[in-house]
């Protein structure tokens, strides 16, 4: 084979400058022929003897074969060098293309799996027929002082424990309570429960008057709109403006029944409370519409319309009502309390944890392909409403209302005005 140095010496020995094409066509074959002859002369004598005895045609054929072998080896060497340089690039390109395709496939599969689980467990899951009532999770904002359970109290002026005064106070309260029960001919142990029909009639008149004023003056709609506008800043950014679409305050009235007076628990028979059963069969509906801004933070580019209508169709509970003094009620909130609220009497009411509220919740999601009445959404809304109710007025939580002064005052005195008809006014004699 011809080395690189020999080829270079051949090129340097050429005194005339010729083009590359002429060199390949004319000069290169003659030079290869000379090189081959030199190679044959340098071989062994036996090989040289065979070549000299061979004919000229055989020598040419042998030369062509040897030339083709040399060219083939040179081309193979060049191809191997080119392949050794281009193979890592091809492998890296294949690796990049395969990693991109692999990531695309994995991403699509993850989205499909997420959609399958979402549709199966969120949309088509049947709502549970019975849901437990949630319990309050935070510390109560106010509570009753149970001073009667302790045997001593602390005198704030002197800073000493006065046991005798505490015992005298408890004894005086017990005697006063027994005196009230005796003079009202009420026996806590044997007295039968009352129906409260008279109270239902008075309460129904009040509710009816409230409904008439609400519908004629649009007080409820105005109050709700102003409330939503004030709280709109507290809404998350992915929710659009809330619009009221339906409002129904009902047409039936609650029924109070089975009222009984009994001693309050953990009071050592020194405090009374009333237990009243409440039953309301009505349909109170609140409907609203909004949009879920999916393409956050670019608003309004992709929005999902949502329509909700929540109706309360049944409410059953046991109401506990008691009358306490301001000293027995201790506030634990950080809000400032007026001095007037620290005196007087308070009406305290709460509901037992065995209450029952039935809802009829309708939901509609989407613009064209709409999802209607998704059970999971109904469960979430029902749970949050019950949680809101439990954290405010379900035992041990309670609501307190300060009672106004009952002593007659001149500023509160009123007189009914009787309007006479035309017939009565004509019959009235004139002086």
Curated annotation (Swiss-Prot):
Pfam families: MMM1. The chain crosses the membrane at residues 104-124. The SMP-LTD domain is a barrel-like domain that can bind various types of glycerophospholipids in its interior and mediate their transfer between two adjacent bilayers. GO terms for cellular component: endoplasmic reticulum membrane; ERMES complex. One of its GO terms (molecular function) is lipid transfer activity. It is a single-pass type I membrane protein. Belongs to the MMM1 family. PANTHER family: SMP-LTD DOMAIN-CONTAINING PROTEIN, TEX2 PROTEIN-RELATED. Residues 125-431 are cytoplasmic. Residues 1-103 are lumenal. Homodimer. Component of the ER-mitochondria encounter structure (ERMES) or MDM complex, composed of MMM1, MDM10, MDM12 and MDM34. A MMM1 homodimer associates with one molecule of MDM12 on each side in a pairwise head-to-tail manner, and the SMP-LTD domains of MMM1 and MDM12 generate a continuous hydrophobic tunnel for phospholipid trafficking. One of its GO terms (biological process) is mitochondrial outer membrane translocase complex assembly. This is Maintenance of mitochondrial morphology protein 1. Its main location: endoplasmic reticulum. Residues 412-431 are annotated as: Disordered. Keywords: Endoplasmic reticulum, Lipid transport, Lipid-binding, Membrane, Transmembrane, Transmembrane helix, Transport. Component of the ERMES/MDM complex, which serves as a molecular tether to connect the endoplasmic reticulum (ER) and mitochondria. Components of this complex are involved in the control of mitochondrial shape and protein biogenesis, and function in nonvesicular lipid trafficking between the ER and mitochondria. The MDM12-MMM1 subcomplex functions in the major beta-barrel assembly pathway that is responsible for biogenesis of all outer membrane beta-barrel proteins, and acts in a late step after the SAM complex. It comes from the Eukaryota. Residues 192-404 form the SMP-LTD domain. It is found in: Endoplasmic reticulum membrane.
